Amino acid sequence: MLKKTLLSLTAVSMLASAGSALAAEYKFDKEGQHAFIEFRIKHLGYSWLYGSFNDFDGTFAFDEKNPSADKVNVTINTNSVDTNHAERDKHLRSAEFLNVSKHPQATFTSTEVKKDGDDYDITGNLTLNGVTKPVKLDAKLIGQGDDPWGNYRAGFQAEGTIKLKDFNITTDLGPASQDVELIIAVEGVRQK
């Protein structure tokens, strides 16, 4: 009886650990320009200023049936900030904002993924300007399936908000310009 119980417990623990290992690994499709990291911030409270980071890389693990096995990792070259205005971009790269000479990369590493209806709540650590803080992203699965080139793809859009001061960006842009909205749209190619 004890032997059967031990065998059952061993089998259950192996299945549980195998479940977390079943999440498929995906790499962001940057070559086809099917991945974007964008942001927007209010300009003095009068309008939105939009920008993006053009150089980044990332991976995610996705198991639709076991979201707790899902993971997201993103690395951003902060020097690639682009708001369609060269002087503003230069200012954003300076020590007053992103301080790219001292902090050339920003990273996001998920710590937990939970399914919430049709959406996913992704919690993780964002390191920006040398400061690491927890951030929550609300993500949606846009679609998944085979592509014409023999690969399998999955696409997500995630959104979240960060406060500039939380990341030691203390330049005062006025009370309406303290929060930055993040929009991340990625299409990942499943790794074989």
Swiss-Prot record:
The UniProt entry lists the main location of this chain as: periplasm
Q: Where in the cell is it found?
A: Periplasm
SUPFAM superfamilies, per database record: YceI-like
* Annotated signal sequence range: 1-23
Q: What are the entry keywords? A: Periplasm, Signal
Pfam families reported in the protein's UniProt record: YceI
Q: State the source organism's domain of life.
A: Bacteria
Q: Name one GO cellular component term.
A: periplasmic space
Q: Which InterPro entries match?
A: Lipid/polyisoprenoid-bd_YceI, TTHA0802/YceI-like_sf, UPF0312/YceI
Q: Which HAMAP family match?
A: UPF0312
- Family indicated by similarity: Belongs to the UPF0312 family. Type 1 subfamily.
Query: What is the protein named?
Result: UPF0312 protein ECA1782
